[in-house]
Amino acid sequence: METVVWSKPEHERAGTPLLVMLHGYGRDESRMAKLFGSLPSAFTCSALRGPKEIGDGYGWFLLDYFLTHDFADVISSTNAVFGWIESVKAQHSSISLFGYSQGMAMATTLLRLRPAQFRAVVGLSGFVLENELLAMSESFEARPPFFWGRDRDDVVINDAATEHTEAWLHEHTQLTARTYPAMGHSISAAELVDVSAFLRHYVLRPGGVAQGAA
């Protein structure tokens, strides 16, 4: 990835759990970087910039209102993120994902293709891609911990996408689902409190893959 913002300087990252953060459609890495201070400080957070220019911002693949996608775009961006993770993962005790909006679609696609690679996943105000090729490639030996946060009245994610997302998450993950009334298509302070508790429990607690103080 060409542009990455880190929560810690390089000399403080070794041995820490890594949280890879993926922004939404038409946004950029700065949206995720603003959240660093609201997440457990034991993590090294990395906010990645999507490779496609979308208006004044960036994205991971082109979308329309119905969330129709070009699978070649999806795989291109997915491979770019996998390549970047490969370049840094040896420095870290575990890898987890955090995706907002389209970033949640990216995070779940990464999870579907390499489920054993990720300790936990957070998906906020987003969706899971409905794609036969991805469905055929899935191979989950265990249910990974997944936090799904949203507003039931979010008008950006259509009902069909939400229904598919809910069904997929219940089938394939160890799901923690929370809703936040009046939040809209955004991220709330209360939601970040719950996300932090989830990450502490599934990644930082004693006996987990990674340990540390929040």
Stretch-by-stretch model annotation:
Residues 116-128:
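A conserved short beta-strand
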Residues 1-94:
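Serine-hydrolase catalytic machinery in alpha/beta-hydrolase-like enzymes
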Residues 147-150:
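Short beta-strand/loop motif that positions the catalytic acidic residue
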Residues 34, 109-113:
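Active-site signature of alpha/beta-hydrolase-fold catalytic machinery across serine-
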Residues 98-103, 107:
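Gly/Ala-rich beta-loop-alpha elbow adjacent to hydrolase catalytic centers
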Residues 128-145:
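Conserved serine/cysteine hydrolase catalytic core
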Residues 160-214:
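C-terminal catalytic histidine-bearing segment of alpha/beta-hydrolase fold enzymes
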Residues 130, 152-157, 185-186:
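Acidic catalytic loop of the alpha/beta-hydrolase fold
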